[in-house]
């Protein structure tokens, strides 16, 4: 043993705890110097020797009716620093009171020593019944390993477990496979979540365990070597599984060394320390990203081979009595019971372009699957191949043909990614496979994000997409050729991780791809523009004032025509949705839809002049007047009297429903201060409407109070009338993007009234997000190119720290700057905010004022 257990001279909990802690210190200091299997074996043997010693100390060795048996992971001899100590005490008869007391003391001693104990005391018949009743118990028993006591009893248990009717092979397989299906669903059917569970994520250790359990039930094999010797896997598959298992074991062992409580989730804050233990180094976060790339590639290998071998087992051992139905697909492929098989061996080696034909057949019949023998041939052919499939002219034709087939993405591109074909086709794919982005914004690796973007585009064809994505659904359904949009999505993030602007580098890549694949010049220009500008609409909608005609004109000039606008809109929405499920909400949908509508109007009007909002303002007034006439008791005179105080900008930036709501509120208001919050009138968010005489620090008071109540602010609209009254609107949501419920709205109304009724500035105690301490975002202030002399547009990039807006607004007040508008965007740990400002003379900021503002923001947001 590397670090042996020393038998106790007397029963002493502290002595065992000391040995246990010394073992952990040995593992921490020597982790890099020993093979992981040696460390796991050493810990398993440490526990074995401890239990045998205690079995003797508590006098249980004298009782010939008892047998101590390791089960579960402990039975498999997979002991990690925080693994449960699972064992069975098998008894030939009901335990007497004296023996029961000894067992209780034995177990309690282990708990006192700091072990998490999972134990059961059962007779042979009780074990059999419990195993028959529960697949988890049955699985634990199948991994039983003798430790101490009556060995013949252990053999009797083994005989019971080998009975043909004790979980017959097919029933056992179906039960364990169903567990896998349910587990995959919990993890969104992907290995590529950026905070994965080493044990339970697809491709994790549980997928290896599934192979063990199937082989164990079928042949009695207890490890990968036994499975290889049984002929169930090929030597190449064995080598790949062994390498992947070894890496996951190292990561899990390191994770357990840095934690105090059992957990297998590789959270961001843990990835840094695990990477250090595994000696992954590099500037910034490169060490973590290198480790996670290797980790995700290991998951992918295990997931792929697990899927292949599970198929192989089902086809060759469980479906042997089914009638065989063979259907010819073409000269190279045939269908055997709905599984695609090759008609000649080595087809993929001799004619590699036929690999693309395999996935074409999947799109033609959605009932088809790929036979395990075909998957094996595919896997071996890809392992042997040195060049890229895209170098073959016939393969290029067949690759492009896929995009116009029904279910092209779900039926062809997704399995091509899963089985390594995309990596074999596109030279750039290998670099992004398993490439994570160490931030709180992205949920998936780059390759998984791209595939999910493609899937989202295809989803726009489904009838159920009409409600959440009405514009995209309409656009996508009328496209006759979706190939360009799919190719743009395939390349939009393909250059990430190389350094430089990934959009510009990706545009170069897609241009080369398009030329190689025979696209014409118009198509090449469209593709390169889409990839290079794939963030344009998202940035404009979320970080610009889209009600400003100049903003709309500049956006329209960049887009140029309706075809590009349609493509860009679909790509933008799919990209946002595929980045993080929580990002897309009705508020973002409204922003994108509004920009789409304005740009369409700009194209219709022509590009030689700004979009004229006069007609829209008048339409809003008339529609609001109609609503008020129908639904309120206000007269036209009363309405007009209220509207006289509202600047034209107010009617442009608010919908008719909002205007009608505000008008009714103002008509009923008898005080100088009005604060109302509603979900009814602002699409996509909860609206706060504030009406009062302008006052110092108003914005600061509002955002500080909102922050103290733990809401997300998405938009701030500051409108001041000529007589000094503000008509301010704030769009907020709960932190998870949901609308604010009634009780929370009333509570916030009360808090805002209190804050605005006093000159005292509100404060709240900042609560740091522990995840943020591992991220470093440099504060950056950018002033957009001055288009106007009456206002300044500023972008702020900073760590999304608690009270950020309160600090920023305090700087504005300190420098006597007026805030006209704000767009608040949080992207993971990063705040990307947009402000429109004027100085105290209602002019654009001077160069000196911009410099002073930049300096103060750095001082406040990055204190030394």
UniProtKB/Swiss-Prot annotation:
Residues 687-766, 793-864 form the ACT domain. Its EC number is 2.7.7.59, 3.1.4.-. Keywords: Hydrolase, Magnesium, Multifunctional enzyme, Nucleotidyltransferase, Repeat, Transferase. Transmembrane segments: none annotated. The keyword Magnesium applies. GO terms for biological process: regulation of nitrogen utilization. Residues 329-686 are annotated as: Uridylyl-removing. Uridylyltransferase (UTase) activity is inhibited by glutamine, while glutamine activates uridylyl-removing (UR) activity. Residues 1-328 are annotated as: Uridylyltransferase. Its cofactor is Mg(2+). It catalyses: [protein-PII]-L-tyrosine + UTP = [protein-PII]-uridylyl-L-tyrosine + diphosphate; [protein-PII]-uridylyl-L-tyrosine + H2O = [protein-PII]-L-tyrosine + UMP + H(+). Belongs to the GlnD family. Modifies, by uridylylation and deuridylylation, the PII regulatory proteins (GlnB and homologs), in response to the nitrogen status of the cell that GlnD senses through the glutamine level. Under low glutamine levels, catalyzes the conversion of the PII proteins and UTP to PII-UMP and PPi, while under higher glutamine levels, GlnD hydrolyzes PII-UMP to PII and UMP (deuridylylation). Thus, controls uridylylation state and activity of the PII proteins, and plays an important role in the regulation of nitrogen assimilation and metabolism. PANTHER family: BIFUNCTIONAL URIDYLYLTRANSFERASE/URIDYLYL-REMOVING ENZYME, BIFUNCTIONAL URIDYLYLTRANSFERASE_URIDYLYL-REMOVING ENZYME. This is Bifunctional uridylyltransferase/uridylyl-removing enzyme. It comes from Pasteurella multocida (strain Pm70). The gene is glnD.
